[in-house]
Every structure is written in structure tokens, then in C-alpha cells.
Regions:
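AAA+ P-loop NTPase nucleotide-binding core of proteostasis motors
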Residues: 1-384
Length: 384
């Protein structure tokens, strides 16, 4: 059989169905290329998540494998654990994946593992077994109906997030063994839940202190070595925390690195555009546009940069120095429909200033500003 196969593979001349000869020469294939749907997911994630290319790559790879029908049978689409310091974008990447695939950032079945620090609390997930108090009175969280609730006509998959998995008890980890390995969960009433169409994400801050200790400024070529050390430190911390049976069922552990000044600068533009979209979707009917000057952005970066807290600290700075002042200007009647506001930094760089640059702008013009900002962010992310 093997000689015949070798002869078939080595043949340079083949015949088509109509008997004509066809020159069939070996061609080198490119396994690095992805399909259109996976490319669209990658483009969407890169426009929303900054500085975490490895994590984006892993999500896209798992999704591409699922689309091609090559996923391991009887297992979830992906079992990914995200490690790294707080504010580095672990949860945000999961939400962005849901936003890109299901058109809804809230389409994530989120399990806050801090609520399961004791073994008996697992009943909230799977329900109480027959004969126990509360059986059939409360609905389990992880039912098949709950798992499938965000399916769309074109995308039939679920996104499940076990947030801060290290805070859960061993009982939850043991319960997850069947989900991660066999894509099956048995509820208290003995019904089965199928996770074969689910992407399982786990986030953890375990090892964050050790990783942050490695991010101190260094000289020379230490940057590449530093990233390797950070990844190794995070994974070793996870191996010390979780059991080998649990670790062995995870497809990939991805370490998120701390965000630098360049990443925070790009995140600032994304978050400001989210504020613009919030204005356009406001229920009170007051529509206006705004822009932040380079000096204003630098002020926000100065106030919002904290290596320990990552992007969350920057978001708090935007809420404090942009959103809350805009809210006061709206409430006091100083901002009207169609106004365009410029946000600049004061002469002493101690506060932001707000000035009306235009008024009476049509809604489509203000919407265009938000769309252009989003497009520029996506283009910049693609180039980077």
C-alpha cells in the first residue's frame, strides 16, 4: 500500500475526469494564512485590545480550528487561562471576543470565582441534588438554556468566563475537570450540559507580584529576556497553585504583560471614543461632540498612568477629569444640542479646560467624528 501511495504522491502527471492530462506539480502551502472569519475576529480584537498580541493570536487560532472542523471532538472549542497583573486586559479580551463574534460585549457567561470559596457554594452553579433543601426552588447558573442564551442565527457558540479562578475552592476546580476534558457538566437533577460549543476562559492574578517585580527598568537588551522571565514566572506560579490534573486540561496559559506608555496612549484614544459613543447613545436626547487636544491627552496620561493598576487607573482618570465635568456642564445647561467641545489642558497643567468651538452641528456630523476615531484606532492597531 505504501509504495502505491508514494507513487501516487510523486506523480507529476494526473488525469482529470474527462481523461485529459493535467500537470500536477507539488506546491508549497502556507499554513500561516487564516480564513476570512478568523481575520475579521483578529482585526476586531486588535482594534480593541492593545499590547497583548500573543493572547489575541491564541484566541484567533482556537476559533480558526473550530471553524475548520478540526477541534478535538468531545472537548470545548478552547480552554484558555489568562495570567497577568490587574488592569492588563484579561477580562476585556474575553468581552471583546464576545463583542466581535456575538455583537454583544455582555454576551459572556461570567462566573465570579470569589463567590465559590467554600465547597457547598457549588450548588449555585449546578443546583442541589434531590432530597436536599432548596432542590428545584432555585435555578442553577450553568444550565443548557443559560449556556445557549446568546447564540445568534449565524454564530452558535458560547463564551464562558471563570473570573479570578485562583479564589475558588478545590471543589470548583474538580467540577471543571469534566467541563475542560469532556465538555460535559452534570447538574444536581442529573441532567447533562454540553460545553462542546463553548469557549472557556479563565483569568487569574496568581503570580502577579512576582511578574511586577520583573518589570523594573533595565538597560541594554534586557527587554526580550524580561518578557521571557515574566512569562515563565507567571506559568510557574500557576503550576504551584493548581493541581496537575487541572493544568493538564488547559489548552494554553497566556501571560499578559504590563502595559507601557505607548500602549496606554493608544488605550486612551479607544476609551475616549467609548465616551463619545456613550454621548450618542444617551437617553436624554442631548447630543454633542468633543475632542481632546494633545496637551489634554498628556494630562490624562500623567494622571492615569500607574504600572501597578494598568488600564483601570487610566479609565478612572477619564471618568474623573472628562466624564464628570461634562456631566456637570450638561446639568447646568452650558452644553446644548449640537455643540462641539474642545478639551484642553490649562496653562499650569493642573486641570482640563472646556470650551465651545462650534454649535448647531447635525447629528450625522457628530456621529462621523466617533466613526472616524474608531477607524483611525483600528488602522493604527493593524499597522502596529
Amino acid at each position: 500500500m505504501e509504495p502505491e501511495l508514494d507513487k501516487l504522491l510523486g506523480a507529476s502527471i494526473a488525469r482529470t475526469d474527462d481523461g485529459k492530462e493535467n500537470d500536477m506539480r507539488p506546491r508549497t502551502l502556507d499554513p500561516t494564512k487564516t480564513g476570512e472569519e478568523a481575520e475579521a475576529l483578529e482585526f476586531g480584537l486588535r482594534s480593541k485590545i492593545i499590547g497583548q498580541e500573543d493572547a489575541i493570536h491564541q484566541v484567533v487560532e482556537m476559533y480558526q480550528t473550530y471553524l475548520s472542523g478540526m477541534s478535538s471532538p468531545g472537548r470545548p472549542i478552547a480552554n484558555l487561562m489568562f495570567l497577568g497583573p490587574t488592569g492588563s486586559g484579561k477580562t476585556r479580551l474575553v468581552e471583546a471576543t464576545a463583542e466581535c463574534l456575538l455583537q454583544n460585549a455582555g454576551a459572556v457567561i461570567k462566573i465570579d470565582c470569589a463567590e465559590f470559596q467554600h465547597g457547598h457554594e457549588i450548588a449555585k452553579l449546578i443546583g442541589s441534588p434531590p432530597g436536599y433543601l432548596g432542590h428545584r426552588e432555585t435555578k442553577p447558573v450553568l444550565t443548557q438554556e443559560a449556556l445557549d442564551q446568546y447564540h445568534t442565527p449565524t454564530v452558535k457558540l458560547s463564551i464562558v468566563l471563570f473570573d479570578e479562578i485562583e479564589k475558588a475552592s478545590d471543589t470548583l476546580w474538580n467540577l471543571m475537570l469534566g467541563i475542560l476534558d469532556k465538555a460535559t457538566l452534570t447538574l444536581g437533577d442529573n441532567t447533562k450540559v454540553d460545553f462542546s460549543k463553548a469557549m472557556i476562559f479563565m483569568t487569574s492574578n496568581v503570580g502577579a507580584w512576582e511578574m511586577s517585580a520583573l518589570t523594573k527598568p533595565r538597560l541594554g537588551f534586557a527587554r526580550l529576556v524580561e518578557n521571557c522571565e515574566i512569562g515563565r514566572s507567571g506559568i510557574e506560579a500557576a503550576r504551584r497553585k493548581f493541581t496537575p490534573e487541572f493544568i493538564n486540561r488547559i489548552d494554553k496559559m497566556v501571560v499578559f504583560r504590563s502595559l507601557g506608555a505607548n500602549e496606554l496612549n493608544r488605550i486612551l484614544d479607544i476609551e475616549l471614543n467609548y465616551v463619545r459613543q456613550r454621548v450618542l447613545k444617551a437617553d436624554d436626547g442631548l447630543l454633542f461632540g468633543f475632542a481632546v487636544t494633545a496637551a489634554g491627552k498628556q494630562f490624562l496620561l500623567n494622571e492615569g498612568t500607574n504600572v501597578e493598576y494598568g488600564a483601570r487607573h487610566l479609565k478612572r482618570a477619564i471618568e474623573r477629569f472628562v466624564v464628570q465635568p461634562l456631566s456637570r456642564l450638561i446639568a447646568s445647561g452650558q452644553i446644548l444640542n449640537g455643540d462641539f467641545i474642545e478639551i484642553d489642558c490649562g496653562p499650569q497643567a493642573s486641570a482640563l479646560t472646556f470650551s465651545r468651538q462650534d454649535e448647531g452641528l447635525p447629528v450625522r456630523e457628530m456621529a462621523r467624528f466617533a466613526d472616524l476615531a474608531a477607524l483611525s484606532q483600528a488602522a493604527f492597531a493593524t499597522v502596529a
